[in-house]
C-alpha cells in the first residue's frame, strides 16, 4: 500500500503536467483526420482496493523487540504512581507473518477488459456442407472473344445521298492567252483618278527667254580645285599675312629661368568625378562612435560553424514533455503481426515536392541558333552575394550602348592622384552647343609652336590705334638649347570663321550625267476638284497615240513620298547643245569629283605677261639666315580666316577660380564614402519648393592679354593610371560537355509494403489522339450548298498594244528638267571695270568638310571605354560541384503504424475491484518504443546557401558551336603613322618667256603635292574677334577628386524605412549557461492504492495492556480518523480544478482573458486578474477583459492629463514631446500602484508575445490647437506625433504601417472653444504599443491649451 507521502507526490506530478498542458495553449487547430488504429496500450493501473476481508486468525508471536534503555527517562527518586510513559519510537517493521486463512468469497467483480487473443487453435473438423448461397453479383465482363469468321457479301445498298462538295483543288497551271476580244463600246467618262506618280523628266525644251533676276542664292560649297595657272610675275611684297595654322611642334627650348611665385589662386570649381583610385591604406581605428539607430534587418548570414562542446552541466530537473523526437534508426524487421482491420480511406495527399535534379544527360547535338528573344524586363535587385574569387581577365567585350544617366552618387573618398591618362582618339565633332557664358580669363598657356608663313596678304586699311599696353620687364636672353624631343600636341584652337566666298571660277567641262537626284520638296497642294459621279468601268480600250504637249495644269495635291528608286545606269554622253544666254547664278551644285590627269600639251610660244597668279607652291627651304633685328611693328593686317583646329595640347595649369556655374548634371556614381559619425537627431524640416534657376549672368569683360611667360621645363611622365573597372559579363560561353556518368549509388532499403490505396479520382481527359486511318468511303451525300465566290485569279499576260486613241487633254505642267549639258567654254571676256564695293554679305554657311588629311601620328592609348551592356546569356556551363549539405529539413510526418505485433501471453486474471468513479482523462503515457521508419518526409525548406565552393578546374573546351552572325563593325582603327616626306627636287632654271599661247583646256586637278617645309614665322596679327564656338571637344579625363569638404550639418531625420524582409533563421547560438535550479514543484497527487499484501505476523515485545491505541493503522476500525488525508486530497483537487479553469481572481489569476473566456464562456466582461508571465501570483495585474471582442485591456496610470496651457515658447513651432520635455521626462505609465515598473514591463512584454494584434486610443482635448488636419491650409503638417513602445514614431501621414487614424477630428481651427480629436492606432505588431508619449506642434502661445485622455492598450 502506498504511503500518504507517495500519494501526495503522485498528485503533485499530475498537477505539474496539467500545468504544462495548460500553459501551452495556442489557437485550437482544425480537427485532424482519423488516425490509424493504435497499438495495444500498456496494462492499466491496478484497480482500487477491494473491500476489507474479515480479520484473519492471529499469527504466532513475533520475535522479541530490541530492549530499550529507559534509565535516562526515569527519575529514581520518585516511586509513586507511574502513569503511562511517553510513546516510544516506532519499532522497525516485523517480519511478514504467515498467510492468514483465506477470506470469504468476495463479490463478483466487473467484467475485465478483453484478454489478448489466444493462440490460433488447430484446424477443426470439416463442417457439413452449407446451404446454397444467394446468387452472387454480376461478374466483370469477360475478355473479348476471338474474331469470328468473315461473313458473306451483303446485298447491294440503296443509292446514297449526294456528297458534300470537295475541298477546292490545287491551283491549276496558267492557261494560254485567249483571242483578242472585239473592241468594246466607249464607256462613260470615269471619275478623276488620283494624282499619278511623278513622271520621268522630259527632254530639255528650247531655251526660254531670260527670266527676272532671282534672289541671291546661298553660297554653294566650294568647287573642285582648278587647274594650276601659269606662274605670274612676282608681285610687290604684301603686308604680313594672318597667323597661319599651327605647325608641327618645334624642339623644346632650354628651361627658362624660374619665374616669380604667383599669388595663390582661388579654389577652382570642383572638377568632374575622377576615376576610381587605388584602394587607400587602411586608416587607424577611429574612436567608437555613438550608437546609431537600429538598422534594417540584414540579409541572412551563412550558417555558423558548430561551437565547441560546453562543460557538462549538472543534471537538470525533469523537463516538460518534449515534442516528437527525430526519426529513429530503422529497427530490425519484427515478426509479421496479425492482419489489422482495414483502415479508412485516407485523404488525397498533397502533391509531392519537386524532386532533386536528375543527372546530367549525354550532350545532345547542337541545335539551330534560336531567334533572338525579346528583351526581358529588368529584374529586381538581388541580394548581394558573397564575393567570388577573382576570375581571370576576360577579353574585351563589344562596346555597349550608353546607359541611362544614373543618379548622382555620394561623393567618394579622395583617391590617390592618378597618372595622366593617355590621350583618346579624336572623336567626330559634335553638334555645336549653345554659347556658354564667358569664363574668367585663364592663366596664359605655354607659347605655341611657330606656324607656317602665310601667303602675302593684301594691304589692309590702317587700323585704329590700339591702347598702349603695359611695358613688360625685358627678360634675360637664354642660351640656345639643344633640340629637344617632339612635344605633345598643343591645345585645340577655336574654329575660325568661315572665309568669304571666292570669285566665280571658269565653267568646268560638262560632267557625266549623274544618277537621279533625291526627291524634291513637295509642291503646294492644288485645289481639290469636284468629284464626279462614278461611271461604270468600261472595257480597256486600245492605247491612243501620244497627244500634243498640253498646257500646264494646276499642281495636284502632294502624293505620298515614293520609295527611292534604284540607281539608274549612266546614260550616253549627249551632244553639246548651243550655248544658252548666261543665266543668273544658280544654287551651287555639289562638288564634282576630280577629273583625270590630262595629257601634257606642247609648249606654246611665250605669251604676254598674264595677270597675277595664285599663290605658288612653297619653295624649298633656304639656309637659315642669321636672326635679324627686331623690326618695327607692321600695320595690322585684315582679319585672317580661322585656322584649322590644332592638335590637342597638354593640359594647361589650373586657371583662377571661375564664377560658380549653374548646377551640373549628376556625375557618375562615386564609390561609397566612409561612414560618417551619426549626426544629432534633427527635427523634420518642412520641404521647401524647388527654386527655379536664376537667369544666366552677363558675359564678363575680356581681360587684358597676359604677358608672355617663360617656357617651363617638360614635366616628368605621369604615373600609370588606375586599372579600368571590371567589364560586365562577357558573352554567353559555349555549352560545356556533359559530365561523366556518376557511380551507381547503393540500393536503398526496401520500404514496407503499403496498403492498397483507395481508387484514385478520375484523371483529366487525355490529349487528342493522332489522326486515324482513312475510313471507307461513305455513301454519296446530299448535294452541298453553293461555294463562296473565289478570290480574283492571277493577272493575265499583257495583251498586244491597241490602236491609237484620241488625243488626250492638256496634261499638267511637267517638272523642271535637268540642267542641259554645259556649252563649250567661252573665250575670256575683257576685264570689266571694277565694281563698287558691295556691302559685307552675311556670313556664309559652313562649307562641306574638307578632304580627309593625311593620317596623323598614332595616338596614345585611349581611356577604357564605357562598360558595355550585359552580353547575351551564356550557354549552360559545366555542372557545378556538389553544394554544401543543407540544414536538416523539417521533421517529417509520423510514419505509418507498424504491423501488429504477435499476441502476448495471456495474463493472470486480476482481482476484482470495486467500480471506481469515472476518472479524468489521464496524462499522456510515456513514449512508446520507436516505430518503424516513417515514409519519407516532405522536402524540407531550402537550406541556407552554402559557403562558396572552391573554384572548379576549367572544363575541356566544348565542340565548336555554329558560326555566329556577323558582328557589328569594329571600332575605327587607330590612325597609322605619317609617312616620311619625299626629298625636295632641285629647282629648275626659269625659261625665257614665250608669246602667250591660246588658253588651254582646263587640266585635271593635280595630285596633292608633298607638304612644304615650315615657313618663317610671320608678324603677329591683331587680336581677332572671338570666333564662333568650336565643336564640343571630347570630355576631358576626370580630374583629381578634390579633398573632402567640411562635414555638413546633420540632415533631418528621414521618414522611417519600410520594414525589412524577415531575416532567415540565424545560426544556432552557443550553449547558454546552465540556469539555476527551479523551485521544488508542488507535490503530485497520491497514486492509487496498491494491492493489499498478505497479513504480517503479529508483533511482539510490546505490551499493549497500557492502553496505547493511537496507531490508527493497526486496526481497520481506526480508519475513520483519515479525515486529514481526505481534506488534503480535497484541497489538492480544488487547486487542480482552479489551475484547469482559472477564475481571474487575485489568488487564482489567468494567463490572459482568453483563458477565462474559454473556462467560463457564460461570464460577462469586467475587470479580472491576469498573470501573463505565470509563475508566482504576487506580480499578477488587473486588466479589463472584453469577452465580446476577446481583448485583454490594460489601463494607464494616470488615465488623463489636465487641460491647461502646458507650454509657452516664442521660437519657431516644432514638435515638443510632452513626457520628455514638458512633463519633466515622465512618459505615460501603465503599472499598477502595487507593482514595480520592472515587474509591469515584464508582464507587458509577455502580453505582447502572447498577442498578435494590439490597439489603443488617445483623445486630444484642444483649445486653439490643431491636432490632425489643419482646416485653414488643408494639410496635415501640424498633426501630432505619437511614440510607440519600441521607439517608433507614429505619424499622421507617410508609411501606412506607422500612421494612425482619426475617429473624430474637432481640433482643426482656432475657435477659442474646447474641442477634441480621437486618435486610434491598430497594428499587427504588438511590440509597438502601448503609446508612451505625444508631441503636439501647434502649441506655445498664451491662448493655446490642451489635455489628454489616454485609453487602455488592448491586446488580442
UniProtKB/Swiss-Prot annotation:
Cited function: Type I collagen is a member of group I collagen (fibrillar forming collagen).
GO molecular function list: extracellular matrix structural constituent; metal ion binding
Bias (Pro residues): 317-327, 1083-1095
Biased amino acid composition, Basic and acidic residues: 648-659, 999-1013
Domain of life assignment: Eukaryota
Protein name: Collagen alpha-2(I) chain
Residues recorded with modification 5-hydroxylysine: 171
Domain commentary: The C-terminal propeptide, also known as COLFI domain, have crucial roles in tissue growth and repair by controlling both the intracellular assembly of procollagen molecules and the extracellular assembly of collagen fibrils. It binds a calcium ion which is essential for its function.
Domain (Fibrillar collagen NC1): residue spans on this chain: 1123-1356
Propeptide cleavage-removed residue intervals: 23-72, 1114-1356
Sequence similarity: Belongs to the fibrillar collagen family.
Annotated tissue distribution: Forms the fibrils of tendon, ligaments and bones. In bones the fibrils are mineralized with calcium hydroxyapatite.
Disordered, as annotated region: 22-1112
Organism whose genome encodes this protein: Oncorhynchus mykiss (Rainbow trout)
